[in-house]
Amino acid sequence: MPVNIVGSEAGAKAMLLKQLNSLFFISKIEEAAIDGEFGRALARCQRSFSKTRNKYYSEASATKFDPLQGCQWSRFLYELARCIFVEEGVSSVCDKLYALNKAMSSVDLYYQVAMPDIFMFDHPFGSVMGPRATRTTSRSLKDARSGTTGASILGLANRFSCFRTARSSAIAKSATT
């Protein structure tokens, strides 16, 4: 299924670089890493977005990516930082993308945390998903994908988060309410 980008890919990339440059200095090496992994991150988002029935993620039988839709942009920033970390190893720009995600939407999802391939955010603002998420077992990851267990699977206990997989209701809810 193709992805329809609201605006254009070039426009989304220009917006990202403007956001990053407004907060940080972006070197040519960092910009090249963004260029190199932008398409891969977009493809990872498209694969995940195509599995959801959320009306904001599809349009005319195609997956929709809107850089101005906060949940989608947060997910994209994570995916881009993750792709650059795994493929390019330019951690300085990964740190800046992570910080931008925190500044833009208060989403604390570190790029070294390997999330499931298919998941979505539903009102993620203020969510914290940290390094403990990498300690999942294969059973826990299976459960996380099916939505059958609680927040401790992803190390999110005692944190409010509306992290969702494409097939589940919220995996993590407030343990403090």
Task: List where the protein language model places each region.
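Terminal amphipathic alpha-helical/low-complexity segments used for targeting or macromolecular assembly
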Residues: M1-A103
